[in-house]
């Protein structure tokens, strides 16, 4: 892309693991990755579509109804590390109980657990294994096992059940004004200052610059506490 060496681009891909029922069935409309063989097929399909020899990170998108299926899918990802086709593998949307069981049944520990996390919080859903919101137990389990906790939608953008109010929240904007910064930068710094990796993007150069500038902020303990009450 634009002459940038592949080694300077971090590529993450995800494979699905869902039975054709419940939340996943409603989204996908079909059974996916129910066996290790199917998972392997989906992995190969990803590489064909991407046209790459390797990815930097391959994630299991979410847990299945059946933990056996989650384990089978994850174990299909494990050979990617030895072959060099994935520099690391991990999971997404796994809560503490699902992650603990996975850890007890696989050979390669997930490098990362990517979950929805922001000042806004995220509406929980009654679905096996999911972490959708501020789940201290999941974060603590990740920390205890040296698994990176990563936040998607760190600005509260996509949340089950509605839109986010983060960028218009009075508390967020008050803290931003005190630091001569923006609401987005404060929201991102609230996440990263907790040692969480924030995943965000923009095609607006000024927004990208603002996001990067968030690392120059240091929020006080009282500001962190006040922002935690915004949800």
Go through the PLM ranges and name each one:
Residues 62-231:
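Beta/alpha (TIM)-barrel catalytic core signal, keyed to glycine-rich beta->alpha loops juxtaposed to Asp/Glu
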Residues 33-50, 70, 99-100, 133-135:
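Short, acidic/polar
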Residues 47-67:
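Active-site groove signature of glycoside hydrolases
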Residues 15-38, 63-68:
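Active-site mouth loops of central-metabolism enzymes
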Residues 2-8, 22-24, 60, 87, ...:
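Lumenal/extracellular "mature" regions of secretory-pathway glycan-modifying transferases
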Residues 8, 52-55, 86, 110:
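Local beta-strand N-terminus motif with an aromatic residue
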Residues 1-13, 19, 53, 72-76, ...:
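N-terminal binding-site loop/beta-alpha segment at the start of enzyme catalytic domains
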Residues 6-20, 58-61, 114-117:
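A short, structured active-site edge motif that brings together acidic residues
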């Amino acid at each position: 892309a634009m002459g940038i060496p592949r080694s300077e681009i971090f590529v993450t891909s995800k494979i699905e693991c869902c039975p054709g029922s419940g939340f996943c069935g409603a989204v996908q409309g079909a059974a996916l990755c129910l066996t290790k063989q199917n998972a392997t097929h989906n992995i190969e399909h990803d590489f064909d579509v991407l046209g790459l020899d390797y990815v930097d990170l391959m994630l299991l998108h979410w847990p299945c109804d059946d933990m056996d299926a989650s384990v089978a899918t994850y174990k299909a990802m494990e050979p990617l590390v030895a072959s060099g086709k994935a520099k690391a593998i991990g999971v997404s949307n796994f809560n503490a109980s699902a992650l603990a069981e996975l850890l007890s049944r696989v050979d390669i520990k997930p490098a990362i657990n990517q979950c929805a996390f922001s000042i806004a919080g995220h509406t929980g859903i009654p679905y096996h294994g999911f972490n959708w919101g501020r789940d201290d137990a999941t974060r603590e389990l990740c920390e205890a096992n040296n698994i990176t906790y990563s936040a998607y939608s760190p600005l509260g953008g996509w949340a089950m059940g509605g839109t986010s109010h983060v960028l218009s929240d009075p508390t967020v904007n008050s803290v931003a004004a005190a630091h001569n910064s923006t609401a987005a930068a404060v929201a991102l710094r609230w996440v990263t200052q907790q040692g969480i990796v924030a995943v965000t993007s923009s095609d607006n150069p000024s927004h990208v610059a603002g996001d990067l500038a968030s690392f120059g902020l240091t929020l006080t303990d009282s500001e962190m506490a006040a922002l935690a009450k915004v949800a």
